[in-house]
């Protein structure tokens, strides 16, 4: 079975140190330590144990550590501590007392919201001395209002921060701490130019002296090395390699399948509970996410859809509820906007070379045809002129660009996710590393399973086909090389315990469900979901502010029901169960063990006497006879 137990592990923790003992107990304010204890921070992780003391000493730090290793606390705790120390030496009446002293730059809105939430939890016992504001989302007018009080910590994306600095809505004259989280992603999203303009000494936005820098990244790419000189001065470089026990917590598998059989496999995995615990299913576009959700709903599998079309508050609320155990399955759209330009260029170059060789003869034929067409189409003499040939019309399909600051695959802290399923293989190896980084976090074990479509199987079924699957084999080779290089491990092929043929018994049920999920119904579900989430996000915002407990009753996994409902698909017959998986102890996987035939008629206890009469031959009753 594909089940993986989420057993806690100390592989990522440094047991030699404790937040309640020196040096941390003497370096960090007691109010911050109590807040950390409330969040179950007993021992620091490796990156926290190394980075926090260095940052508190005033040194710049460049740290490379995998996702889920606790990088957020490694820079937030020193930032809060330095603000508390600075305010302790100033009078509350002084003009310098309330000022923005720390800037946190992140690549996505979701990560900004998460960092803001963590910062508020860390400072909850500081009596309002440390104010934190997230300006990554929201309009300019709202951001100006938030910045009027000169918050101590501002969390933003580089583009938003640059806009605020240009409009003079934010002053950084008292800035003393600058942290960049997920630096490799921030650069891959195209924020390098914005970051360069922010750090330009001629602009005068960032003080030339007295600003401590911190760069956190999952990888140390050439781009990260390139901006090191912009942000850091003589930094301490931490390249933290995890012990073998930590890297082995993630079990990575793949299986070759057709585009249609993806739906069969995901149905078998989830409905028969071959993967236990909470799962994140990644797809490559928004339409694909709704198609998977509607398909799974046919079998009674509840799941949430998360994509950049939904309001930020809804997306973040889904993550919080997933972490609390409210939802077990999330279908997340990872459109990979702007990621890994170099790798994509290499793929395009390879494709262009192969296509160029094949199209040489076609180009020559096309040139000859053009010459013949020009000779035949010479304009006739006279005042009337032929209408000029119009340029080729643009395709009618509306090309929707993904929001580069919205992604659940990158930097978001999913806790206790036991598995990640790449329903659609990502476009690049970097995207793969960040997707599988959503599981096996904080010392817990995890499983990653990827569906790979062979080139010869791509495009055979247009109804369920996706363009990105055409490159699955090339991308997967890059993924295997990178996994081998960075973690010295291999992605193993999943053999389904030699019983993949027995899955065919479920195919007819998959076909029935997939036929009901048409393109029209997917579009209807897409509109309904956005409308519903906008209503929840905007109309009820004031209500939830006054009644925070009511927010826990807001559900995101409600069935969309635009597809034809087939209730029999929700129950798996018992004759199918033993062939693929053992029945779990304590009951059947199915909601109902079986439905037997009843001898009773539709009207209840009814016999030959007609409606309401007793069964068998009885004495006839004369309705006119007086009793």
UniProtKB/Swiss-Prot annotation:
ATP binds at residues 65-72. It comes from Cryptococcus neoformans var. neoformans serotype D (strain B-3501A) (Filobasidiella neoformans). A motif (DEAD box) lies at residues 181-184. This is ATP-dependent RNA helicase DBP9. Residues 366-378 have a biased composition (Basic and acidic residues). The keyword Nucleus applies. A motif (Q motif) lies at residues 40-48. Its main location: nucleus. GO terms for molecular function: ATP binding; ATP hydrolysis activity; RNA binding; RNA helicase activity. Residues 340-365 have a biased composition (Acidic residues). InterPro entries: DEAD/DEAH_box_helicase_dom, DEAD_box_RNA_helicase, Helicase_ATP-bd, Helicase_C-like, P-loop_NTPase. Residues 599-618 have a biased composition (Basic residues). ATP-binding RNA helicase involved in the biogenesis of 60S ribosomal subunits and is required for the normal formation of 25S and 5.8S rRNAs. It catalyses: ATP + H2O = ADP + phosphate + H(+). Residues 337-410, 586-627 are annotated as: Disordered. Its EC number is 3.6.4.13.
